Amino acid sequence: MESTLSVSDEKLTNSSTALNNCGDNKESSQVLTTANTTTDNQQVQPKSQHQQSASTEPLSKERTNISLENDLILVDPNQQSKNTVSDSVQDTTGVPSDHGKQQTIGDQIKILISSNPLNIEEYSSHLNRLATILYEENFTSDFLVTLHYKILQLMDELPKFVDLQNPLKSQLYTIIDKNFDILIKLATNYKVMEVSTASIRFLTTVFMNLNYWEVYNLLNKKPVLYHFLNLIEFDLNDCYTRFINDYQRFTYDKITQPTVKSRSRSKVTKKRKVKGDSDFAGSNTATATTSVTTPDANTSHEGKQHRSEAFFSLNPDTSDHDKYVADVISGANVQKRKFRPDVKLEHHRIIKKPQPAADKLSTKSSNYDPDVIHECQLPSAEEPHKLCLRRFSRKYELIRHQETVHSKKKKLFKCFVCVKQNPGVGPRIFTRHDTLAKHIRVNHKISGKEAKAEVAYSKKHAEVVEEGDITVHVGRRKTKVDFELRAHMEKRKSSGDDTNYMETSDLESGEEEVTFNK
C-alpha cells in the first residue's frame, strides 16, 4: 500500500499537524494531495502500469480502497487501511463524513456516465447501478439531468445486445433477472414521469422479445413476474406457438423422429400401465397382484396402448390418410351408409302430437316427421336419480345425444388436416363427428367430397376411451340469447308445462375441446 501513494513524509507530517491544530470536529473522510514537485512525479511513474490496467475496466469492482483520477489520490473512508496516511487523517469518532460519501458516489457517477457496456452482462450491471443511484438519490443535483439522459440512452440501446442471428444463445433474461425489481420501483415511485414511463416501456419490450423457455424459467424463479405479464396482457400461449414454429426445423434436423417416438412411447406406456393397474386394483396394496395376468390379456392391452399412441402422436404417418381421401374423391372407394338398428334407441319414448287427419300431408319425409318427438329415457347426467327427458325432433339427434352425453365410452375424432398442416402443435380432437365436419369446413375451408372423406376417415380411425379419462369443454362462445333460452326452457320444464314439447340440438353444435385428465 505504501508503494502506491505519491505522498512525501514531510507533507504527511504537515497535513496531520494542521488537522490537529484546527480544533474543530469536522469529519474528514478523504485526503486530497496534489503532486506538484518533480520528486513526487518521479514516485508516481513506477506504478503507471497499475493505473492503466485499472482504467480499462470501469465497471469492475476495485480490489483496493484507493483509486487515482487525474492528479488526485482518493482514499475510501469505508475501509481501514494499514498505511500511516489513513491513520493520521481518520476522525477520532471513526464515522465517515457525508462529504466523503457524496464525493465517492460522484466519482462512480462520472465513471458510469463516461463508460459504455460491451456485452449484455455489462449492460445489465450498468443499468442496474444507474437505476439504483437514481432511486436512492444519494447524489448532488448537479448529476440529475446527466443521469436521466444516460439511463434513457441505455434503454434505447437495447437492440444492440439482442442476438437476432442466433436466438438460441439469447441472454435477455439476465436483464429481467437483475433489473426487474429496481425498474418497477422507478416505474411506481419515482418522481420524474419520463423515467417511470420509459422503465415500463423498457420492461415490456424485453418481455416481448424473450424466448418461451426464458419466460418459463423466470416465472419459476420469480412468480411475481406473473402479475406484470397480466398487466401488459402478455400472451404466453402465443409465445409458445411462436417457439414451436420458429424452432421446429432445429428440432427436426438435430433429433431424429424415430428416437423421439420410441422415448415418448416408452414413457407414455409405462405411465398408462401404472395408472391402469392402480385403477383395476382399487388400492396401493393390491397393485402387486395385477402383474400376474394372462398372456392374452397383456397382448390386447399392449395393442390398445400402441393404437392410442398412434392416435395421439404429433407426427403420424399420413400416407394411408392421403390414399383414402384420394380414393373417395375419385370415386374408387364408394362410401355405403351403414344401417343403424333401433337397438341403440331402446331407452327412449316416441311422442306423437295429436293432429286431425285432414291436416296431415300425404307426402312426408322418411327422415323427419313433425308429429313425432323422441324423448330420452336414460338417467340424467346431472341428477342420476331422475330421467333425462330430453326431447328431439329427429331420431339421429337422439342417437347423437345418447352417444355424447350418456355413453360411458367416448369416441374421439381427430382432425387429420390439422396434423398435416401443423404437425408440431398436435391434432385437434373432437367428441362429435358433426363438430369435426364444421371445424373442417370453417377452419380449413374444405367442403364437398373432400370434407366428407376427411370425416369418414376420422370416423374410421376413431379412438374409444373411458369417460373418466377425458374432460369435454364446450369451446363455442355462447351469446346472451343462448343463456336466456336455456334458462327459459329449464323454467318451463320445472313448472311441469309440456307445451314446449320440442327441444332442438342447435345449442349443442359448438366446438368441443378434449382435455385429458392426469
From Swiss-Prot:
Q: Does the keyword Translocase apply?
A: no
The annotated regions of Polar residues compositional bias extend over 1-41, 77-95
Q: Does the keyword Nucleotide-binding apply?
A: no
Q: Where is the composition biased (Acidic residues)?
A: 505-518
Start and end residues of each stretch annotated as Disordered: 1-63, 75-101, 261-307, 492-518
UniProt biased composition (Low complexity): 42-52, 283-298
A single Gene Ontology CC term:
nucleus
Q: Enumerate composition-biased segments (Basic residues).
A: 262-274
Where in or outside the cell it occurs: the entry states:
Nucleus
Q: Per its database record, what is this protein's job? A: Probable transcription factor involved in the regulation of filamentous growth.
In Swiss-Prot or TrEMBL terms, this protein is called Filamentous growth regulator 15
Source species: Candida albicans (strain SC5314 / ATCC MYA-2876)
Lineage at the top is:
Eukaryota, Fungi, Dikarya, Ascomycota, Saccharomycotina
